[in-house]
């Protein structure tokens, strides 16, 4: 029997506010344990929360950017459960009246557009953090993260594969970064993904029993966890077993998911309205004010790159998939008119060094090559000061040292040779040294010509103008 995977996501994104959602404590990452907290975020008796207006604005902006409806009236609720990192024994969240609802994000999979529904986006406070490896006799609790504002983005169960899920998450992350709603640093926990997954016979309209997977700290982990869990559930069903509705923890080093607890239902949390906070009332003028502040989003920027710069759709998609990459590219083309070359260098060498160094696209500003320096390198090729081959050598040194390309070219004497007489001497030497290749060329073997070009470049240490080499070499070979 062929099975279909059904996936829905719960994505938690930390909002980029300077202070927490209900108090004035800083949201800055790190710090000594329990130094970024106060009686409000640690739930001491007698304190009252005050809602951070900026957190609501960011949530509305996220909703507008993902095509959601914005609730004119919503409220906050207490979600009651006991866990050591939750000092009040309840979390202030939203239950039946979320701030944003009925949205969508369009993604492209194998050239086909697909719409993924956003069921709701609501605001809530983060919990603390348990540290299990710093004390032999038990676990320690750090409340620095307690009360940091979050949005939880809940999708409809519209995703059907690990690849669709990865593409969706990359698109969502880009939207949150473009709007500056969240920095989405997964390594710091500011973007966290829970995956709800079930399988069903292909063609069936009924959903199977779902499991929820947690502890997914990278998109790679999400992809691996989905593929593992789908296989596990199919094996259970094919062996005559029953899939248990439960929460499972992903163990990335082992590549397996492990049972944590049976899945809770809404009634297990005993939701009730938060008595210490008034309802959230949003009027049209506030929504429009926030809408006007939404910057150019990835899809809009991609279309502009295609129309304005004439870039291929794929290139435009890669260059706009990360705000940091797009900003780097746009800064680069301020200093060069060769936009296509800038795109090629970004898509090729820049992406390669990011991958080689294990850097995320958002970390592009950490490399030593600045956008204006990349533009200078492109200009050196365009004005025939250096060849493309030499440019790649210069690029490597720029990456290692951060030096300007002009400085490297001057220091190493890499200026391109355009003197016809100098190139002619190198051509004659290559012909004299390789009579067999000359004979092969005369007998119609085109590869021999490429070999001879390579020999000329070797003699000139890669500095000869390739076009002149081709031209002069053909002229000399015709004379033989």
UniProtKB/Swiss-Prot annotation:
Gene Ontology molecular function: asparaginyl-tRNA synthase (glutamine-hydrolyzing) activity; ATP binding; glutaminyl-tRNA synthase (glutamine-hydrolyzing) activity
InterPro entries in the record: Asn/Gln-tRNA_amidoTrfase_suB/E, Asn/Gln-tRNA_Trfase_suB/E_cat, Asn/Gln_amidotransferase, Asn/Gln_tRNA_amidoTrase-B-like, GatB, GatB_C_1, GatB_Yqey_C_2, Gln-tRNA_amidoTrfase_suB_CS
Keyword Protein biosynthesis: yes
Pfam families in alphabetical order: GatB_N (PF02934), GatB_Yqey (PF02637)
Keywords assigned by UniProt, alphabetized: ATP-binding, Ligase, Nucleotide-binding, Protein biosynthesis
Catalysed reactions, as listed in the record: L-glutamyl-tRNA(Gln) + L-glutamine + ATP + H2O = L-glutaminyl-tRNA(Gln) + L-glutamate + ADP + phosphate + H(+); L-aspartyl-tRNA(Asn) + L-glutamine + ATP + H2O = L-asparaginyl-tRNA(Asn) + L-glutamate + ADP + phosphate + 2 H(+)
EC numbers, comma separated: 6.3.5.-
BP GO terms, sorted: glutaminyl-tRNAGln biosynthesis via transamidation; translation
Enzyme class per UniProt: ligase
Coiled coil: none
Described function: Allows the formation of correctly charged Asn-tRNA(Asn) or Gln-tRNA(Gln) through the transamidation of misacylated Asp-tRNA(Asn) or Glu-tRNA(Gln) in organisms which lack either or both of asparaginyl-tRNA or glutaminyl-tRNA synthetases. The reaction takes place in the presence of glutamine and ATP through an activated phospho-Asp-tRNA(Asn) or phospho-Glu-tRNA(Gln).
Subunit and interaction comment: Heterotrimer of A, B and C subunits.
Family the entry assigns: Belongs to the GatB/GatE family. GatB subfamily.
The protein's name in its UniProt record: Aspartyl/glutamyl-tRNA(Asn/Gln) amidotransferase subunit B
Native source species: Caldicellulosiruptor bescii (strain ATCC BAA-1888 / DSM 6725 / KCTC 15123 / Z-1320)
């Amino acid at each position: 029997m062929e099975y279909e995977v059904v996936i829905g996501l719960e994505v938690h994104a930390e909002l980029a506010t300077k202070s927490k959602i209900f108090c004035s404590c800083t949201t800055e990452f790190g710090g000594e344990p329990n130094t970024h907290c106060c009686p409000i975020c640690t739930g001491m008796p007698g304190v009252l929360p005050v809602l951070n207006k900026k957190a609501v604005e960011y949530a509305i902006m996220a909703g507008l950017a993902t095509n959601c409806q914005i609730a004119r009236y919503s409220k906050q609720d207490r979600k009651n459960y006991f866990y050591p990192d939750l000092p009040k024994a309840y979390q202030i969240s939203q239950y039946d009246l979320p701030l944003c609802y009925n949205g969508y994000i369009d993604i492209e999979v194998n050239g086909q557009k697909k719409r993924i529904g956003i069921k709701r986006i609501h605001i809530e406070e983060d919990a603390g953090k348990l540290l299990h490896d710093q004390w032999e006799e038990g676990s320690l609790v750090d409340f620095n993260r307690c009360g940091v504002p979050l949005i939880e983005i809940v999708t409809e169960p519209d995703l059907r594969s690990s690849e669709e899920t990865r593409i969706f998450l990359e698109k969502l992350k880009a939207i949150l970064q473009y709007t500056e709603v969240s920095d989405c640093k997964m390594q710091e926990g500011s973007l966290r993904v829970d995956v709800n997954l079930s399988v069903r016979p292909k063609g069936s309209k009924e959903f199977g029993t779902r499991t929820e997977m947690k502890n997914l700290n990278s998109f790679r982990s999400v992809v691996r966890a989905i593929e593992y869990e789908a296989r596990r559930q199919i094996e259970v069903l094919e062996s005559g077993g029953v899939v248990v509705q439960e929460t499972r923890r992903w163990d990335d080093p082992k590549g397996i998911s492990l049972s944590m607890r049976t899945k809770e239902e809404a009634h297990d949390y005993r939701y009730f309205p938060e008595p210490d906070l008034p309802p959230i009332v949003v009027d049209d003028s506030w929504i429009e004010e926030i809408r006007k502040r939404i910057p150019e989003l990835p899809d809009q920027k991609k279309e502009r790159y295609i129309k304005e710069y004439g870039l291929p759709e794929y290139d435009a998609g890669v260059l706009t998939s990360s705000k940091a990459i797009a900003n780097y590219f746009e800064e680069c083309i301020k200093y060069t008119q060769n936009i296509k070359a800038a795109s090629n260098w970004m898509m090729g060498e820049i992406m390669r060094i990011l991958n080689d160094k294990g850097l995320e696209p958002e970390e592009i500003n950490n490399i030593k090559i600045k956008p204006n320096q990349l533009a200078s390198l492109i200009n050196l090729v365009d004005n025939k000061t250096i060849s493309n081959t030499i440019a790649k050598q210069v690029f490597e040194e720029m990456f290692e040292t951060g030096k300007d390309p002009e400085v490297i070219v001057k220091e190493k004497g890499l200026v391109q040779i355009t003197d016809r007489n100098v190139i002619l001497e190198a051509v004659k030497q290559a012909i004299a040294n390789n009579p067999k290749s000359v004979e092969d060329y005369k007998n119609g073997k085109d590869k021999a010509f490429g070999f001879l070009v390579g020999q000329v470049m070797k003699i000139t240490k890669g500095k000869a103008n390739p076009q002149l080499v081709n031209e002069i070499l053909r002229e000399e070979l015709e004379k033989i």
